[in-house]
Amino acid sequence: MKIYTVGHSNHSAQYFIEMLKTHQVDCIVDVRSVPYSRFQHFNKEEISASLKKENILYLPFADEFGARRKERALLDEQGKVDFEKVRSSAPFQRGIERLTNGAAKGFTIALMCAESEPMQCHRFGMIVPALRSEFEILHILKDKRVKQNTELEKDLVKKYKTDIATAYKLLNKEIAYTP
């Protein structure tokens, strides 16, 4: 099974939809904790309506995959969100199950957040590690090209000069939210 990730960045609504259509995405899973943007066309209500016109399903997954957690049990010793703890949580596991079921039903799913660069976003650092054994993961870039997750992981290992498991932990420390 295949799953995409994408960042809406500051794109126009039309360009963003073109990005999705280029890869036949028919289901957007919004992983933003707060599904609103300074670019109003990416606010939950507006993006949902725009996608519906294009026959693309919109699903808000803030509870399952949002990165701005406040529960103490999901924070590390420094008070930052601990991605491993989030991945072990019941809401996150329900989200994985919903993604798997959707993909099995034939939906072409993309996880959407705001950040254009996947390595700077929790969709890569927090969510992808839970998907990498079940899915082929492709990151849609600004220019509509895709980058294989295996290539992004090579970049991550190179950045931190360590193994992939440790590199994901270091990325967590770098990008995690502090409530």
Q: What is each residue range found by the language model?
A:
Residues 1-179:
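Residues lining hydrophobic/aromatic ligand-binding pockets adjacent to catalytic sites
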